[in-house]
Amino acid sequence: MTEVEQPPQNGIDPTAGEDDDNSKARPADIEQDMREMERRKRVEAIMGSKLFREELERIVDSARDGGAGASGILQQLSDIVGVPVSRVGSVFKSSNCMVPINDIRGVESMGYAKGEKILRCKLAATFRLLDLYGWTQGLGAQITARLKVDQEYFLVNPYGLLYHEITASALNKVDMQGQIVEQGTTNFGGNKSHFVLHSVVHAARPDIRCAIYIGCSPVVAISSLKTGLLPLTKDACVLGEITTHAYTGLFDEEERNRLVRSLGPNSKVILLTNHGALCCGETIEEAFFAACHIVQACETQLKLLPVGLDNLVLIPEESRKAIYEQSRRPPEDLEKKFAAVAAAEDGAATAEKDAAEAVPKVGSPPKWRVGGAEFEALMRMLDNAGYRTGYIYRHPLIKSDPPKPKNDVELPPAVSSLGYLLEEEELFRQGIWKKGDIRKGGDRSRWLNSPNVYQKVEVLETGTPDPKKITKWVAEGSPTHSTPVRIEDPLQFVPAGTNPREFKRVQQLIKDNRRADKISAGPQSHILEGVTWDEASRLKDATVSQAGDHVVMMGAASKGIIQRGFQHNATVYKAPYAKNPFDNVTDDELNEYKRTVERKKKSVHGEYTDTDFSESEAVLQAGTKKYPQSEPETEHQVIEIQTQQAPVPRQAEVVLSDALVSQLAQKYAFLYSPGQYMYACMKMAPLMHKVYVIHKVEPVSKHNYPPVNDGNMSIHHNESGAGFMAQESSVISSTPVRNALASVSLPEERNHSILGLSSTPYRTISHFGFNCPLITSPTILLHPEHRSIWQRVAEQREKVVSFIDLTTLSLDNRKLLNVVTSTHPTQCQSQSQSFISEKHIQLEVTPPKRKQRVYSATISSGLDDSLDELDSLMSGLAINMPRSREQDSGLYRSYTFLPSNHALPKDTDANNRDQTDRERPEAEQEESFHCAGDSGIGDSTGRRPRLATTSNDSSIQEAEAYTQGKHVKLTLSSSPTPTATQSPATIEILINVSLRNAECVQTVQTHEQEFRAKLERVIDEEIHYISQQLAFKQRQAELHEQQTTSRAPIATPSFTTMHPPAPASSSSMVHRSNSAPELCHTYSYVAVGDLSTKQDQASPQLPAEGEPLNDILSSLEKELERLLNSVVTAHMLHNKAIIHECRARFSQLADGIVSS
């Protein structure tokens, strides 16, 4: 029997512990009826198919027009419905047209008795098996089967049909005398002479329900022997007791008695002399089991007869009994079940046993049938071959149905044709018909079949003078339908992993609340039943005295106690209605009254004290005006919701207190008083100055120079101090100090006030406390984590400016200082170009001895702090460059930039390239590459992109050239002509750029020109700043002279791009102090004025030779080195550059100081 499909229960079996009717076995006839119902549904679906009907009509019409008979039409139908003969032609010897065995379809099965259809199918299948095995001899053989034990009706094959033509509906039903009780679907009757043999056996042995006559050649040959069938093989032993009868063919009363005596009470196989054998059994399966084995045993014995009977070895009697009992025993897995059933039936009566054998007990395991497994396997073979046996399998081949695809939403065939199911037979087994279980799916099917299109209907109430509108939803009667949702799984929309017991628990709680009468009708309605709107408005405005004069009969009802179809009949009772005397009381008054009562309850002795009043009460009072609707005081009321964002400080703000001013003044005294640092170097006592603010280095894109203010800073001189102090005071007054007020003792006659650039310190949002925007330093783009390098750079700048102002430029030389201004100040160059001419910045090869000094030089402290970070930055550079050959990284450890005019063996390509690069101006050379800005070394082409493609000889020569020390030489000359480089006061800055590994070598070789431009831009910004400071001091001195000689007012120096100059005459304008630094490509010293006029104000001459001068020069060289190293370190960390060391030397500074 097939297993009944269990619906999914989401992982939990709700029927655990309950009796499951599906686990009990149904009777065979009921199970067969259920299967036939499913098959009838299939047949009805196919017969109702439009495609199948059209195909049948086409076949019939074509056959009728062609003149073919009914046999041709049936043949074509068999070809359509059946399967090709070639599928089973190799299995059996004969291959005929496959006529279906089970041809009882539709309502025809209802005309047969209970279980008769199954027996017909089995018997017809047995005829088909005998035909396929070739054990038939024309029309003479017969197979009979008893329908019931208590009835003498038998099924026999009609005389005139071959075995392969017999179907289930073609069998005739006859009685014990051979009279036809029920004719089959054919016109053939029965053969009474052949049926006599079967009738004698059935009459003598009621336990035999099937008899098969075997008249094939091997069986007839063995039945003709005197010895009969010998126990030579296992096939002969499983037959049990075999009897022999001298059959003559004529049956009279004496012959029947001898046949009964020959058969005996136990034997089920009898050999008919010279005619064959008659195999009997309690079931059709057992009779066919005996027929198969007797044919095999006879064939084996015939093959052994030529050796002689004396040479044959017979199986002993004990072994034969053991083999016979083993063949009747069920398999091991079913033997225990059968033993339990047998033990339970030991105390039952014989009649009850017979009844139990006839009708299987519900819930008991199926009885084992001898030969049932072999017969069922043969039925599967016939079904697979397309014979359609109709056999009911007791042990299905497949345990359960394969898994089906499940979707959340499916489209069921609500109104559709079933023509597409013609070839899809699996859909019939898995379709909606299998789900139509009436016992369990009654409510569900009714819900699924409920209408899904509704119409909104509004019904007026009855029984009230002011009826309300009741909304109802009724099913729409139109034939249009929407798309329904097919639900295969009852838990289809339930989330996975949930427990259905939780739902049942909540459901039980809801029921308990309902039983406890805890469910109310909800909020009370303020709409008065039976009162019109005019009357309601009058009642609302009526006074208490007038309320008694107006009585209204009201009707009220709860919808919860009215049936769904009678909700519009709202009137249940009527009662007089009077005006509520508290209707005139507002919500605010009620809330205030409730709060007063609550406060009085909280008082200790009953006296009212307003101690609980708070600011929140005022908020509540303000909220009641905005929201007049009252709510219960026990619930929280939301007055107002505002969304704000807490302010997040941009940076930590540190405000300097007055107590720290003196400490900071001492710590940073060298920044605001350069003379103090000079006296420290010259072993003089330092001067104390008062500091007001701390300067902040702003990271801006370019320099801007604010206008000069008047009268904001004054320097007072005292009588104490003379001589060299005069020079120092002038230096201090001309040095841009961050709002420092210096008091120096000078002669009284030199007491004067000098105009300076100053502004009142003011508070800013900066975390430095105060800010004074006097001037901005050059741009250094640096990561915020390296913010300390900015301060170090600013400190070194101040030191260098102070040293240059005090030592390298005396009072006379400073009067000669001025910046060459451009004749076209409105022109502006691109910021990406360099501001230093190539005539002043040259890349040269230094001698080997200089190389050793540069390599042995110590690295600055600022660079030592960032070497580890530099290695990590360089390792992160993903540069894929082709390499000509592997080279030792130690060769390029101190490798630096290759100058544009480096000395190499001149070949044609190198000579042309060097000559071209040297003759081109710098602006054109910079256009040959693209600067990457602040993102590091970009994807630009350098001066030597052919290093990877040159020959080995040239590569070796270039490597030898690169191993030498290379320096960037920056010259500050005192003459505007570039050729005058040997004049006094010349500063040379040598910058050594070295590499650390071979990978950096290739990077520099590729991006040499780009990196040079970046380096020039860095140096240019520093020189801009230094020259601006020096020019500013000179302008202060000129302003002082103009003030003493009553000259015209000085024009305000301004930055070109930010403050364009106003038109004025040449007499009222003076030279700008580098007001357009972007246009200045040379920084030189030009003579303005008479040198002799200032000789009397000169300071005492410094000694030409001596220890102080050497100390000053060495200190200045160190300070300039630190400045350049700090600047380079800052740019290296931001641009991922690889500058290693910067050094400065003063080639002709000593001669210039001595000559001055």
Swiss-Prot record:
The modification Phosphotyrosine is found at Y608, Y627. It is a peripheral membrane protein. Residues 1-36, 897-956 are annotated as: Disordered. The modification Phosphothreonine is found at T480, T498, T609, T611. It holds the Pfam family Aldolase_II. GO terms for molecular function: actin filament binding. It is found in: Cytoplasm, Cytoskeleton; Cell membrane. Residues 22-36, 904-929 have a biased composition (Basic and acidic residues). InterPro entries: Aldolase-II_Adducin_sf (IPR051017), Aldolase_II/adducin_N (IPR001303), Aldolase_II/adducin_N_sf (IPR036409). Isoform C is expressed in nurse cells. Isoform A is produced in the nurse cell but transported into the oocyte at stage 1, localizes to the oocyte cortex at stage 8 and to the anterior pole from day 9 onwards. Isoform B is expressed in the somatic follicle cells that surround the germline. GO terms for cellular component: cytoplasm; cytoskeleton; female germline ring canal inner rim; fusome; germline ring canal; lateral plasma membrane; plasma membrane; postsynapse. Keywords: Actin-binding, Cell membrane, Cytoplasm, Cytoskeleton, Developmental protein, Differentiation, Membrane, Oogenesis, Phosphoprotein. Its main location: cytoplasm. The modification Phosphoserine is found at S478, S603, S614, S630. GO terms for biological process: actin filament bundle organization; adult somatic muscle development; axon guidance; centrosome cycle; cystoblast division; female germ-line cyst formation; female germline ring canal formation, actin assembly; fusome organization. 'Hu-li tai shao' means 'too little nursing' in Chinese. Belongs to the aldolase class II family. Adducin subfamily. Required for assembling actin at ring canals in developing egg chambers. Probably interacts with other developmental proteins involved in nurse cell/oocyte transport through the ring canals. Important for normal neuromotor function. PANTHER family: ADDUCIN (PTHR10672), PROTEIN HU-LI TAI SHAO (PTHR10672:SF3). This is Protein hu-li tai shao.
